[in-house]
Amino acid sequence: MRNGRTLLRWAGVLAATAIIGVGGFWSQGTTKALPEGPGEKRADLIEIGAMERFGKLDLPKVAFRHDQHTTAVTGMGKDCAACHKSKDGKMSLKFMRLDDNSAAELKEIYHANCIGCHTDLAKAGKKTGPQDGECRSCHNPKPSAASSWKEIGFDKSLHYRHVASKAIKPVGDPQKNCGACHHVYDEASKKLVWGKNKEDSCRACHGEKPVDKRPALDTAAHTACISCHMDVAKTKAETGPVNCAGCHAPEAQAKFKVVREVPRLDRGQPDAALILPVPGKDAPREMKGTMKPVAFDHKAHEAKANDCRTCHHVRIDTCTACHTVNGTADSKFVQLEKAMHQPDSMRSCVGCHNTRVQQPTCAGCHGFIKPTKSDAQCGVCHVAAPGFDAKQVEAGALLNLKAEQRSQVAASMLSARPQPKGTFDLNDIPEKVVIGSIAKEYQPSEFPHRKIVKTLIAGIGEDKLAATFHIEKGTLCQGCHHNSPASLTPPKCASCHGKPFDADRGDRPGLKAAYHQQCMGCHDRMKIEKPANTACVDCHKERAK
């Protein structure tokens, strides 16, 4: 049994090292899934195209079934040395070599070792893979299997499970194990060390390709994760996957344990942050100090986001470190205004908020309201900082504050935000509204007005985002009573929508179309199944003939 566990651990190492062989298996050194195609779906298909670095390939790349080979090698009682060489006690991630010297040598390494192993197994009467002369069995432009590989993300649930794991020993702090994964390069000691409260995304240092001695992201991630999983397995503690499918198969990911209520991950981050427009050094004078700051409730947004990269897409740093008023090369010249207000980007404030109003509880109203711009809308987020006048802000007084001081200013701004006033007294809201001004073939419709208002209020609940923007008592009413001032007694629909459609006023539907468009559209967006759009008599009974 002990030998069986040992072989399993070696199988995991084989899985890790083959996957991360930058320049060994992938010509581009990435963990891209192979193109979709017919046949068996596998998460372990790896594209071998290392020869591509020396020029155009003569034959198609090889679709290598890694988990299948891992199982076979383990079954023969072999370990990683069957495919990987070592130097100074460290195993190379390249296949049967330490360096890439020439195209001819690389070709010989693959053919001699892969085909050689297959041939030896065939001589022993065992099931094996393609042999000499069966080139297209491996170099097949249409492999028999198709990739089901799915990228794995390190969301806050998975992150917390690692933070809370007693199997991952603390490094540098008896109470925290952050240093087991997070590190920075210390120039003085020439070592990787943990930077407390400076933990960053892996992508902050590790990109798609290796740079100097810094490995690419896929190499760094697989090396760290799989080796840690193997070390933990040696202690007989619960550990993570050690093969391709364990992480990258969709069915495996669907079974991951999910922590629903994740405690806040502590990185020394502020509860509240002050977002200031930072002009670039070369910004024109008129671009400086022209916008009021935004108090950002960082703690509340942490609870809503799935991971830090939801907002911090590369480095965990302030937005304005890259996105200045006039843009920087690091931000690909995406200016601060675009970074915060781009309506179709999930990484901008406005873009993320737009997805929230598309949820069924909000879409009934917001799906019908056309986006507009006004100074009043800007003023919901952009407000004056208490204790600082416009001249002080323009002179850079807020920018010159220490981080802790800016956080305090932001907190005071958040606490001073106007509280939502809810809606009008429910006793003043009609319980039912009889809609019968155009009743003809059908009887008037009894509209459960107060019930619908209560449903909308319940849908908002304690939502802070809704509370921030639904300030006035009549805000909620304007989902239906649109294009008129918020009021307890808004104009009737017929005030704007004529009973017959007026072609000369083609900017608005007639009354019948307005009712049906508003009611049916709301039901569709809120996914209300009954009454169905075709069930006329569910809303207004048919008149007796």
Swiss-Prot record:
Signal peptide stretch: 1-31
Single GO MF descriptor: electron transfer activity
Gene designation: hmcA
Modification after translation, per record: Binds 16 heme c groups per subunit. High-spin heme 15 has single axial histidine ligand and the other hemes are low-spin bis-histidinyl coordinated.
Binding residues annotated for heme c 13, in chain numbering: H449, C477, C480, H481
Protein name from the UniProt record: High-molecular-weight cytochrome c
Residues that hold heme c 4 according to the record: H159, C178, C181, H182
Binding site for heme c 16: H516, C536, C539, H540
InterPro entries documented for this protein: Cyt_c_III (IPR002322), Cyt_c_III_dom (IPR020942), Cyt_cc3 (IPR011346), HmcA (IPR054813), Multihaem_cyt_sf (IPR036280), Multiheme_Cytochr_ET (IPR051829)
Species this protein is from: Nitratidesulfovibrio vulgaris (strain ATCC 29579 / DSM 644 / CCUG 34227 / NCIMB 8303 / VKM B-1760 / Hildenborough)
Binding site for heme c 5: H183, C202, C205, H206
UniProt superkingdom: Bacteria
Residues annotated to bind heme c 3: H111, C135, C138, H139
Main localization, broad class: periplasm
Pfam families, per the entry: Cytochrom_CIII
